Curated annotation (Swiss-Prot):
Its cofactor is pyridoxal 5'-phosphate. The record marks H221 as: Plays an important role in substrate specificity. The gene is glyA. It is found in: Cytoplasm. It is an enzyme of class 2 (transferase). Its EC number is 2.1.2.1. This is Serine hydroxymethyltransferase. The modification N6-(pyridoxal phosphate)lysine is found at K222. GO terms for molecular function: glycine hydroxymethyltransferase activity; pyridoxal phosphate binding.
Amino acid sequence: MKRDDLIFDIIEKEHQRQLKGIELIASENFVSDQVMQAMGSCLTNKYAEGYPGKRYYGGCEVVDQSEQIAIDRLKQIFGAEWANVQPHSGAQANAAVFLAVLNPGDKFMGLNLAHGGHLSHGSLVNTSGIIYTPCEYNLNKETGRVDYDQMEEIALREKPKMIIGGGSAYSREWDYKRMREIADKVGAILMIDMAHPAGLIAAGLLDNPVKYAHIVTSTTHKTLRGPRGGVIMMGKDFPNPWGKKTPKGEIKMMSQLLDSAVFPGIQGGPLEHVIAAKAVAFGECLQPEYKEYQTQVKKNAAVLAQALIDRGFTIVSGGTDNHSMLVDLRTKYPDLTGKVAEKALVAADITVNKNMVPFDSRSAFQTSGIRLGTPAITTRGAKEDLMLEIAEMIETVLSNVDNEEVIAQVRARVNETMKKYPIFAY
């Protein structure tokens, strides 16, 4: 076959973009060479519908081994009794939990998307909000933190069948214990989506929801620093509370419902090359350098947030406990939208994403905020001193969004600075 130079030239362009720029998108990271090698391996050739030891195809005895290693390592990292590593993404993992727990039209609670929630937690344009009935809880307007008292009031009033914790733009620790107490009061299943802070949790730097929640989902990229994919876990398996039975009349365990929801519920064949890459990444999580890396992620985020605050920016909730922060632009730049801010920063090779902020008057296409995170830049070896420089460059760009000369100067500075940092330092 002739080499597809068109696509490989594009891949090289993307490689150069990643090398030259400062990556601050909170959900992005750089994986190790061995994770990429597993992703590009011959395992991509193998169909393996089903689970290890119970497949619908022959010749699965080898991929059974790699998938079982992924399961065992994931359980070891988070102290889970049961895990499923087959979901193709975090949203797929969430969809599988919905399928296992809810019937169409059933009510559930999730964090308001504009307050830092996620599309798959009840957005009306997502299957979670189309098939099921969402109700929202919010951040406290004064503190910018989850209002657990309001959450309890809403739960007692609405009686949801499931309560979801976790989000895509929330920089504070979650009170999983309080959430479990609320869920137990109303007889709800507590599902925690820890996609964003999973790596920090794996390193023991944030509280572990597996100890409290009925079910935990996550992506395997972001802070966890693996290939793009999803997982589902339970700290302890339990009989399903709705009395669903096997053909033999035995009460099904929750793990059986979840396994069936993933396959054949929402997926067919698993991506065994991705699962092998997940296993490699989980192995990296168990190495001592991983905790060093995650500790630096947290330090860098705290320093970047404070440096921005010192320059007059508003950070929702006043700071960060994890890898991310949500910058409310309205205080410092009342007329600047997140869309324009993102475009200007990207032009300077500082990659961020526009994001709605709590009580935002602008649409999701314009927004009044930008979301920042430190996982990717920390993987490259950045320390606190670079965070101070980044805060300065962000302010320079956002104060000159229409000045192409200033943006070009910042871009040149970014490109020169990043020559000192390899793509993967930890």
